[in-house]
From Swiss-Prot:
Protein name from the UniProt record: Xylosyltransferase 2
UniProt KW keywords: Disulfide bond, Glycoprotein, Glycosyltransferase, Golgi apparatus, Magnesium, Manganese, Membrane, Metal-binding, Secreted, Signal-anchor, Transferase, Transmembrane, Transmembrane helix
InterPro entries with a match to the protein in the record: Glyco_trans_14, XYLT, XylT_C
Entry keyword annotation includes Glycosyltransferase: yes
Function: Catalyzes the first step in the biosynthesis of chondroitin sulfate, heparan sulfate and dermatan sulfate proteoglycans, such as DCN. Transfers D-xylose from UDP-D-xylose to specific serine residues of the core protein.
Segments on the Lumenal side according to the record's topology features: 37-867
Main location: Golgi
Pfam families: Branch, Xylo_C
Regions crossing the membrane: 16-36
Residues at which UDP-alpha-D-xylose binds: V238, D266, T295, I296, W297, D399, W400, S480, R503, K504
Residues on Cytoplasmic side: 1-15
Protein EC: 2.4.2.26
Length: 867
């Protein structure tokens, strides 16, 4: 009793404090609860939304020839979206959270009805549902972001129903445009009303069970003549990016005058489109689609592009093809054209597609076929669950196929409800091209023609893993094959199956394997042929315009030009001579990456210049080569494990699948998020401390990495506050505070901001470093004594003065920093030059204008080929 009375007395005395604490806890709980509805349970989803968390290497799985990884987890408590008129100026994400929060507290906001047409009465029940379908544009409305998608008729965002489900709410919160949000809302409302998906699909195939197991390769039968004339092939080349030389090499390898080539270039790849249009003018049987789409990985737009291309190919006068084969620019043949034509001529009634295997339920879950998706804003949004229509025998596994003309005609022109309903189903499906044609064929009258083989060889290195590489464009975990390397060459020569193509090949990753395969098929080039070990890839072309450049690349290319012109001037031996003194004119006209023997050799910058001697305008090309900055400081067994920590090993655009930085040369600006990567030889386990030091000797961060005996690569992106201070940074590796090695990298001092020369003011903060020298919440400056760093004050004063620079003084500082990391390896003249020391670019071995026979297309030879 005494204890009870004492407790009551304490409660009365502190009841205000207790009530306040409980209120705060309740409020925090409500906030966490309301925000959690917008997140996904899956760790990979959180990794996509919180960029500072490294991806879990175990995320995702990959089956042979299938791109989807593990499905997102389900079962989270659903939130709701209740439509309402949006207040002007209120961000959409905040609206979503506010509405969700209000729902949690019990308030109900009814859906906002669509504007009432003049003379039209309000509807309810079935009539209201019918009006909703009509207003949303399905099935008779406008075309949306992808074919068949209901598109809004204005820019207002008004949900026409009460949207239920965490996936739909999350998509609405993350979509960046109101049109996309409205499309998502329309699709979800139709789906909730049961008006979006077909309930059942007719089945015309009388065969039970799965498709044919495949046709083995028979070398003897392959040499026997086929009945009837040789088949003719329509190649559909689906390309994007800037690798025109690799595309030319592919076309050179597969070209024959009896075949037809139709090229679709992604709408975002304007440089490649210009080059392909020019290429197609040389050959009557090569054409470019007069239309272009943005085709994202896993998107419904890819299937739409294929169907439209198929219709085009069927309607080209005089193109009497027998088979449709799709290729990308990263494909390459593994057998000759003669072998392919002979094989298809003996199997002219077969359709070749790769199946996922026997476990249908696992394939459905892994591919997300039981989920509803919609594509808009160049993203595939997961919107909830759905039922697969009755009658469908789901099949698929690869979006690379070889199809007969008769089947293509059936898919494009038929009035069969089977195809129409499957088109509707796959409009809202992830990775539709990996399953649509398989499923149509599996239940169509032509099901007996299906062969389980897509004629491709791919490689999936599970040790390196997919790393959920497409999560920034799809709400799912997926990946693509690894690139082939020289050690894979024997696999490309396999003869057990009739495979005729392999993927993927990337010359910026490894060109040697492309050469090996090319020489194996068509023989070596003559001795002394130039350019066989070189590769060039354009990264900027003048018609792209200044808007295609970032402030970092704009600063860098201008600095490269100035450094190159100083080199040209210094090449003069006669004092006072001005014929080699040039001034740059405008932007560079082009910039290329240059590789030799599969090693990055630097940037080639082509620049229009004016001679100081008042001569005619000229064009020069300058080669800027990166300088190594690795220092191996230790001598222990542990130190010997460190293979490379060199320039380019701190950078951005890290590709964990190929283990390289796609940002070649490590071009970094103050707003970038750099990654440090180390390569290790096998050896004893060790724990390494990594320390980042900025140009003023501020210890920005420190962390430990565990290097197991079998570890080959380690990498980490510390969550540093930005802007980073421009100048030379240092990354040190230590074990027990004894040095193993260090590398330096450059954060480029920007001379441009928003494409304009940097001026004094708030934007000059871009070169002043973070506020209060704080890169992390935790200070690591206490390590400066252990690291024997110089005093901060002199370096900080120099940095303060640099932050005030503009104009030529800022350019001089930028060029000085650049010259510590890049050297001018060569300068040449595109045409005749007044400077006697400049060699013509076409006579050099390194210029982008030097001969490159392996990627040059010429006239068709007597045998109908180019190679």
């Amino acid at each position: 009793m005494v204890a009870s009375a004492r407790v009551q007395k304490l409660v009365r005395r502190y009841k205000l404090a207790i009530a306040t604490a409980l209120a705060i806890l309740l409020l925090q709980g409500l906030v966490v609860w309301s925000f959690s509805v917008l997140e996904d349970d899956e760790p990979g989803e959180k990794g996509r939304q919180k960029k500072s968390r490294p991806l879990d290497p175990s995320e995702g799985s990959k089956d042979t020839d299938s791109s989807a990884g593990r499905r997102g987890s389900a079962g989270r408590r659903h939130g709701r979206w209740r439509g309402r008129a949006e207040s002007p100026g209120v961000p959409v994400a905040k609206v979503v959270r506010a509405v969700t929060s209000r729902h949690r507290t019990g308030r109900r906001i009814p859906p906002t009805p669509p504007p009432e047409a003049p003379g039209r009465q309000n509807l309810s029940g079935a009539a209201a549902e019918e009006a909703l379908v009509g207003a949303a544009g399905f099935p008779h409305g406008d075309t949306g972001s992808v074919e068949g998608a209901p598109q809004p008729t204005d820019n207002s965002f008004t949900p026409k129903c009460e949207i239920v489900g965490k996936d739909a709410l999350s998509a609405l919160a993350r979509a960046s445009s109101k049109q996309c949000q409205q499309e998502i809302a329309n699709v979800v409302c139709l789906h909730q009303a049961g008006s979006l998906m077909p309930k059942a699909v007719p089945r015309h195939c009388q065969r039970a069970g799965k498709m044919s197991p495949g046709i083995p390769w028979d070398e003897v039968r392959a040499q026997q003549p086929a009945d009837g004339p040789p088949v003719r092939i329509a190649y559909m080349l689906v390309v994007h990016g800037r690798a025109i030389r690799q595309l030319k090499r592919l076309l050179k390898a597969v070209y024959h005058k009896q075949h037809f080539f139709y090229v679709h270039v992604d709408e975002r790849s304007n440089y490649l489109h210009r080059e392909v249009v020019e290429l197609a003018r040389q050959y009557d049987n090569v054409r470019v689609t007069p239309w272009r789409m943005v085709t994202i990985w896993g998107g419904a737009s890819l299937l739409r592009m294929y169907l439209r291309s198929m219709q085009d190919l069927l309607e080209v006068p005089g193109w009497a093809w027998d088979f449709f084969i799709n290729l990308s620019a990263t494909d390459y043949p593994t057998r000759t054209n003669e072998e392919l034509v002979a094989f298809l001529s003996k199997n002219r009634d077969k359709n070749f597609l790769k199946s996922h295997g026997r476990d249908n339920s696992r394939f459905i879950k892994k591919q997300g076929l039981d989920r509803l998706f919609h594509e808009c804003d160049s993203h595939m949004w997961r919107l909830g669950e759905r039922q697969i229509p009755a009658g469908i025998v789901v099949d698929g596994g690869s979006d690379w196929f070889v199809l007969t003309r008769s089947f293509v005609e059936y898919v494009v022109y038929t009035d069969d409800p089977l195809v129409a309903q499957l088109r509707q189903f796959y409009t809202y499906t992830l990775l539709p091209a990996e399953s649509f044609f398989h499923t149509v064929l599996e239940i169509s009258p032509a099901c007996e023609s299906l062969v389980d083989n897509n004629m491709r060889v791919t490689t999936w290195n599970r040790k390196m893993g997919s790393k959920s590489q497409y999560k920034h464009i799809v709400d799912w975990c997926g990946c693509s094959p690894n690139d082939f390397k020289p050690q894979d060459f024997l696999r490309l020569q396999q003869t057990a199956r009739p495979t005729f193509f392999a993927r993927k090949f990337e010359a910026v990753v490894n060109q040697e394997i492309i050469g090996q395969l090319d020489y194996y098929l068509y023989g070596n080039y003559p001795a002394g042929t130039p350019g066989l070990r070189s590769y060039w890839e354009n990264v900027y072309d003048e018609p792209d315009g200044i808007h295609s450049l970032s402030d970092v690349t704009l600063t860098l290319y201008h600095s490269f030009s100035r450094l190159g012109l100083r080199r040209a001037e210094a090449s003069l031996r006669a004092p006072g001579e001005s014929s080699c003194r040039f001034e740059p004119r405008g932007l560079p006209s082009s910039v290329h990456l240059y590789f030799y023997d599969d090693h990055f050799q630097g940037y080639l910058v082509t620049q229009a210049v004016q001679s100081s001697a008042q001569g005619p305008a000229e064009t020069l090309e300058m080669w800027l080569m990166p300088q190594g900055s690795l220092k191996l400081l230790g001598h222990s067994d542990q130190a010997s494990r460190l293979q490379s920590l060199e320039v380019g090993q701190v950078g951005t655009e890290w590709d964990p699948k190929e283990r390289l930085f796609r940002n070649f040369g490590g071009l970094l600006g103050p707003l970038d998020e750099p990654v440090a990567m180390q390569r290790w030889a096998r050896g004893p386990n060790l724990t390494v401390t990594v320390v980042w030091i900025d140009p003023t000797y501020v210890v920005a961060t420190s962390y430990d990495i565990v290097v197991d005996a079998e570890t080959e690569v380690t990498q980490y992106k510390p969550p540093l506050s930005r802007p980073l201070r421009p100048g030379a940074w240092t990354v040190r590796l230590l074990q027990f505070w004894e040095p193993l090695g260090e590398t330096r990298f450059l954060v480029l001092p920007l001379t441009f901001n928003r494409k304009l020369p940097l001026r004094k003011g708030k934007f000059s903060q871009m070169i002043a470093g973070p506020p209060h020298n704080e890169y992390m919440e935790q200070s690591f400056q206490g390590l400066s004594g252990i690291l024997n760093l110089p005093q901060l004050e002199p370096a900080e004063e120099a940095a303060r003065l640099h932050a005030e620079l503009t104009g030529p003084a800022l350019e001089a500082w930028t060029d000085g920093e650049q010259s510590s990391f890049w050297s001018v390896a060569g300068v040449c003249a595109v045409g005749p030059s007044a400077c006697p020391s400049l060699e013509l670019c076409r006579l050099t071995s390194w210029s982008s204008l030097s001969p490159d026979p392996k990627s040059e297309l010429g006239p068709v030879k007597a045998d109908g080929r180019l190679r």
